[in-house]
């Protein structure tokens, strides 16, 4: 289809009609062969998002659709553009401007996608004639009951997709699919989970959930759905935990839906008691007299340099201005001089922190032992956009180097290949390396149960980042798993872990 690639001089090259000829013939012959037994779709990029260097929707992209008007499945460039994250494309329906012309040149029903989560927007697109059908892939992963809720007028109960592409990462890693909003996704057959229903309680036991981050909120909500009376205690004056922090970073505002959806449902329940600004101690828990305790106490970022690339602390950091990600954002208005963001977690957060600080007009230096910025985000289709965003904003990106040690106001950077040392002057250092679970209260509870009869608990469990630091999706899943597993036979829980669905073709 592209003139820069197709250099034929026969009837299959030259004009756009000739370049489309082979595609049209293949489609027509395929359709003749299969008849009405199945659909034949042609998916191509109506706009490669390369400007004049590629196909554009208002020029040859449209011409191809016009020639094949009754056949095509129009797409916006490759998957990374087709399934953009909310971080880089916050607007719902962002693909509509590229494809709304299709309905005017075909008699076929037209379906469109673009992370459409708002029922009002969906209806408006149909009413104004842009689309006939709404395609909702990621939104229906987040909430499989999306159409039913719209039909029933229960739009306030929709679990809206946050556009994080955790579902896409699962596909790229070839592992069972996961969703930040919907922890039951991928567990329908193996564990029998459903996002709208859950097995009832076994007894009249009460539960205490400590911490209202993603794991704590999910665990509280699901225990209450089962019928248990739940007490939720939060040390802060707001519910949400790490979601509050991360959704406040540049580009991640949609992530707040994770806490907002759960808080809304929790507030509708009459079997949940919520206590904010309540940092519980061992004595407080003993006074409450609740024997089933779920600790969603989160995790804390290390400041000593221990991460993926090194397992021993960096020498010389003790006397320097070293910050955690949370401290860096909180202190941003008062920071000055070069700020180093050191990423040895190699996930998504360090790139967001660097971008946020640069947006605050700081001089930022991004250092990582990896060969690219935020390598894990290749799985969410964001890596190139993240690296581009940092470079465009003026961040000095240094890859393939670790922090060997600190001397005065200098960092000794070590090349991961040659071992060569270089010096870098800085004012503040933000460490994004590794998190340590906050288990102090859990350890006290376990020790008390093992040594005394006072405050004996029938069930003490770490959940979320306090159990194993990970993604928000991981925390939500662990909170859900804890609620589903409560008072259930351990044998059944373990058995489900090893069940594998084996599809067969007939």
What are these regions (language model features)?
Residues 1-210, 214, 219-225, 229-230, ...:
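Flavin-dependent oxidoreductase catalytic cores
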Residues 3, 43-45, 74-79, 113, ...:
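Generic beta-strand/beta-sheet core signal
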Residues 69-72, 131, 272, 290-291, ...:
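Local beta-strand N-terminus motif with an aromatic residue
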Residues 82-88, 109, 132-133, 244-251, ...:
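Short beta-alpha connecting loops at secondary-structure transitions
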Residues 104, 224, 267, 358, ...:
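Anion (oxyanion) recognition and catalysis
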Residues 106, 129-130, 270, 289, ...:
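Short, structured coil segments at secondary-structure junctions
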Residues 158-163, 245-275, 307-320, 378-405:
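N-terminal glycine-rich dinucleotide-binding loop that anchors FAD/FMN and/or NAD(P) in oxidoreductases
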Residues 201-233, 239, 275-289, 296-378, ...:
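Rossmann-like dinucleotide/flavin-binding elements
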């Amino acid at each position: 289809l592209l003139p820069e690639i197709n250099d034929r001089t026969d009837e299959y090259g030259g004009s756009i009609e000739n370049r489309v000829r082979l595609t049209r013939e293949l489609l027509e012959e395929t359709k003749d062969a299969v008849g009405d037994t199945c659909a034949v779709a042609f998916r191509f990029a109506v706009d490669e998002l390369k400007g004049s260097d590629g196909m554009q929707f208002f020029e040859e992209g449209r011409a191809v659709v016009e020639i094949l008007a009754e056949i095509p499945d129009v797409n916006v460039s490759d998957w990374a553009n087709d399934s953009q994250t909310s971080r880089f494309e916050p607007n719902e329906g962002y693909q509509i401007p590229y494809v709304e012309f299709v309905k005017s040149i075909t008699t076929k029903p037209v379906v469109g996608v673009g992370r459409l989560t708002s029922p009002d927007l969906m209806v408006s697109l149909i009413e104004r004639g842009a689309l006939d059908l709404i395609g909702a892939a990621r939104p229906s992963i987040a909430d499989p009951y999306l159409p039913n809720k719209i039909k029933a007028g229960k739009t306030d109960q929709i679990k809206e997709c946050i556009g994080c592409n955790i579902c896409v990462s699962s596909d790229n890693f070839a592992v069972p699919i996961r969703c930040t909003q919907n922890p039951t996704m991928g567990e329908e057959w193996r564990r029998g989970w459903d996002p709208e229903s859950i097995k009832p309680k076994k007894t009249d036991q009460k539960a205490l959930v400590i911490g209202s981050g993603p794991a704590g909120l999910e665990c509280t909500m699901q225990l209450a759905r089962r019928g248990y009376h739940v007490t939720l205690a939060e040390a802060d004056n707001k519910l949400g935990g790490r979601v509050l922090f991360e959704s406040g970073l540049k580009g991640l505002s949609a992530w707040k839906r994770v806490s907002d959806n759960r808080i809304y449902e929790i507030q509708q329940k009459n079997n949940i008691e919520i206590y904010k600004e309540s940092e519980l101690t061992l004595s407080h828990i003993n006074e409450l007299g609740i024997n089933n305790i779920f600790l969603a106490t989160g995790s804390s970022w290390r400041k000593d340099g221990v991460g993926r690339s090194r397992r021993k602390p960096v020498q010389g950091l003790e006397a320097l201005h070293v910050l955690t990600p949370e401290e860096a954002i909180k202190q941003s208005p008062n920071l000055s001089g070069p700020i180093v963001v050191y990423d040895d977690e190699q996930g998504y957060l360090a790139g967001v922190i660097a971008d946020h600080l640069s947006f605050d007009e700081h001089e930022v230096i991004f250092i990582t032992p990896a060969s690219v910025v935020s390598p894990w985000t290749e799985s969410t289709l964001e890596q190139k956009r993240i690296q581009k965003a940092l470079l465009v904003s003026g961040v000095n990106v240094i890859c393939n180097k670790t922090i060997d040690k600190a001397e005065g106001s200098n960092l000794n950077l070590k090349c991961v290949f040659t071992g060569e040392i270089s010096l870098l002057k800085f004012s503040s250092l933000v460490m994004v390396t590794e998190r340590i679970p906050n288990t102090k209260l859990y350890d006290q509870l376990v020790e008390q149960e093992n040594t005394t009869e006072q405050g004996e608990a029938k069930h003490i469990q770490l959940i979320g980042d306090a159990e194993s630091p990970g993604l928000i999706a991981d925390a939500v899943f662990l909170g859900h798993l804890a609620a589903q597993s409560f008072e259930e036979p351990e044998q059944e829980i373990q058995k489900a872990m090893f069940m594998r669905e084996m599809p067969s073709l007939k």
